[in-house]
A protein has these predicted regions:
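Hydrophobic alpha-helical transmembrane segments of ABC transporter permease domains
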Residues: 2, 10, 21, 25, ...
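Transmembrane helix-loop-helix hairpins at lipid-water interfaces of multipass membrane proteins
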Residues: 10, 16-73, 77, 150-155, ...
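An intracellular "coupling" helix at the cytosolic face of ABC transporter transmembrane type-1 domains
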Residues: 11, 99-103, 119-128, 132, ...
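Juxtamembrane helix-loop junctions of ABC transporter transmembrane domains
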Residues: 21-22, 29-42, 63-110, 114, ...
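ABC-type nucleotide-binding domain
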Residues: 328-604
Length: 604
């Protein structure tokens, strides 16, 4: 874990190494100050003239200023190193996530990844800052001050041999109890972030179902769980300072008593005031260093769980990667499923897809229908290699998708996913995800083919209209049409529409399909839909059931051979007819009412 995280220091290695060296200089200067002060006290006691003490006093001031300079420089380099380390670590973590396949992403929730990129990295940054400065300073002060205390104080300094083990035992006990609590806290942070993320992204649904009170209670519960665990940890940590203060005060009382008694009994021959002063000062430095060490242990304990969570992501190997010698060009849009089986997890009891054998020629239009959970989306996800097959092979352009360069493959397979996602930016910027170099005319053409221009032209700023995160300021149908336009700009060899017109009316759906046929005549098109009207003009239609291909054929063939298809078609036609009848009835009633009103007005 440490090796994994330390790889993020990189270009900040010099300031990272410089910080402990500057701290060493600071500590050495600090250790001289009590020694010089003791000599000055002895000189004053012996009645030395001011002129005789000036060189020693000047040297003391010089040492103090030098210590200050070393400390200030260490603070600057420490801050520079820790901020740079956190920046690199955040970049490494974010870039690692970009390499993840869907299978990798399934292992970590989005809220957990956000926590690792923010809270966890902040914790590690604070710990890193303390380690390269305070964790170096405290042991050095402890060693040097302990040595000088024995040199100056002799037997009086033996008090510290009793105090230090007591403090160490108490600190170990506290850390032992606190560590598992911090581990639970970060998992509960994930739940808290998940609650916030769901509420913010689904605010319209929350309000439409009047679920504000439920969401408030859910958030309060998650926040309360975090608070309770933090409170438990803080209660244990609260014993740290009183324990330190008791030991410090007790040590000082004993030192003053023993030192004063020794001075009086020996009349200053075995122990004098200067030695007592320096022993007292060194003792204060020893105990302060112990307090700093306790703070470090607490911070490191808190950061340890964060570091493990970050390292877990950094160490995760992408389940999908480019081959050693990848194919860089997709020949055509033909697709072959050669006895493909797939399951999302090796521990899953059943296959999501079972023995799929399917061959699609380049330029063919394929419709895919099936009930919920029939693995329609799973089937098309394998084409762009969002997942790898468990058994069998998927070929695009006659080449196994595992042999392609991922960028080359996915550039030729445009997908409009079931969950339509837009990003914060203008409409034009969102559409240019399909082709960053697309001209304004090409952007407008794609929008026209997707029937998006019907509403975009109505916005005051047109294609410069700002889209909020996730497309929260446009409707579901508008979002779908923008996502289709984005895919069209790519001009791919394979276009996959995963239930991408479910939120638009049938008339607009038909216009979009006509536009696709004229704009991309040689592109292989796979259209997943719930409405048979969206796929009935396809060259072939696949009926999925339970992860298998139940039937395949054109519209007329399936009406004869597939009971599922026939029942779905009949049901949808009946619903459509009833809807049209209701509309006609409403229209006639409105007309009759209008005539009655007109007649009444005329009579009056």
């Amino acid at each position: 874990m440490i090796k994994t995280l330390m790889g993020s220091i990189r270009d900040y290695m010099k300031v990272t190494v410089a910080t402990p060296l500057l701290v060493l200089g600071e500590v050495l200067c600090e250790m001289l100050i009590p020694f010089i002060t003791a000599n000055l006290i002895d000189a004053i006691k012996d009645g030395a003239a001011v002129a005789e003490m000036l060189p020693t006093a000047g040297f003391l001031v010089l040492i103090a200023l030098t210590s200050l300079a070393f400390g200030a420089a260490a603070g600057v380099t420490c801050s520079h190193a820790s901020c740079g380390f956190a920046k690199n670590l955040r970049h490494d973590l974010f870039y690692k996530i970009q390499t993840f396949s869907f299978a990798n992403i399934d292992e970590f929730s989005s809220s957990s990844l956000v926590t690792r990129l923010t809270t966890d990295i902040n914790n590690v940054q604070q710990a890193f800052m303390m380690i390269i400065r305070i964790a170096v300073r405290a042991p050095l002060v402890l060693i040097f001050a302990f040595t000088m205390a024995f040199i100056m104080g002799g037997s009086v300094a033996m008090v510290y041999l009793v105090i230090i083990p007591l403090l160490g035992f108490g600190l170990f006990f506290i850390i032992f109890k606190v560590r598992p609590i911090f581990s639970r806290v970060f998992h509960k942070y994930d739940a808290l972030n998940e609650s916030v993320e769901e509420n913010v992204t689904g605010m319209r649904v929350v309000k439409s179902y009047v679920r504000e009170d439920f969401e408030k209670e859910k958030f309060a519960t998650a926040a309360r769980d975090v608070q309770m665990d933090f409170t438990r940890a803080e209660k244990l940590l609260a014993f740290n300072n009183p324990m330190m203060n008791i030991c410090v005060d007790g040590a000082f009382v004993v030192i003053i008593y023993l030192g004063s008694k020794l001075i009086i009994t020996s009349q200053g021959t075995l122990f004098d005031v200067g030695q007592l002063s320096s022993t007292f000062t060194y003792g204060f430095q020893i105990l302060m260093s112990l307090m700093q060490l306790s703070m470090i242990f607490v911070m490191v304990t808190m950061a340890d769980e964060s570091a493990h969570r970050i390292a877990e992501v950094l160490a995760a190997e992408p389940t999908i990667a480019d081959p050693a010698e990848p194919v860089l060009e997709v020949a055509d849009g033909s697709i072959d499923f050669d006895h493909v089986s797939f399951k999302y997890s090796k521990h899953a009891k059943r296959q999501a897809l079972d023995d799929i054998d399917l061959h699609i020629t380049s330029g063919e239009t394929i419709g895919i229908i099936g009930g919920t959970g029939s693995a329609k989306s799973t089937l098309v996800n394998l084409i762009a290699r969002l997942y790898d097959t468990t058994e069998g092979a998927v070929r695009v352009g006659g080449v196994d998708v595992r042999d392609y360069d991922l960028d080359a493959l996915r550039h030729q397979v445009a997908m409009v996913l079931q969950k339509n996602v837009l990003f914060s930016g203008t409409i034009a910027e969102n559409l240019r995800w399909g082709d960053p170099n697309a001209t304004d005319e090409e952007v407008r053409e794609a929008a026209h083919l997707a029937c998006a221009d019907e509403f975009v032209d109505g916005f005051p700023k047109g294609y410069d209209t700002w889209i909020e995160q996730g497309g929260s300021n446009v409707s579901g149908g508008q979002k779908q049409r923008l996502c289709i336009a984005r895919a069209l700009l790519r001009r791919p060899k394979i276009l996959i529409l995963d239930d991408s017109t479910s939120a638009v009316d049938t008339k607009t759906d038909a216009k979009i399909r006509a536009g696709l046929a004229s704009y991309l005549p040689n592109t292989t098109k796979l259209i997943i839909a719930q409405r048979i009207s969206s796929v009935q003009d396809a060259d072939r239609i696949i009926v999925m059931e339970g992860g298998r291909i139940a039937q395949i054929g054109n519209h007329d063939e399936l009406l004869k051979t597939s009971e599922i298809y026939r029942e779905t078609f009949t049901s949808q036609n009946k619903m459509s007819a009833e809807g049209e009848g209701a509309v006609e009835a409403d229209t006639e009633a409105s007309a009759t009412q209008a005539q009655t009103q007109e007649g009444g007005e005329a009579h009056e």
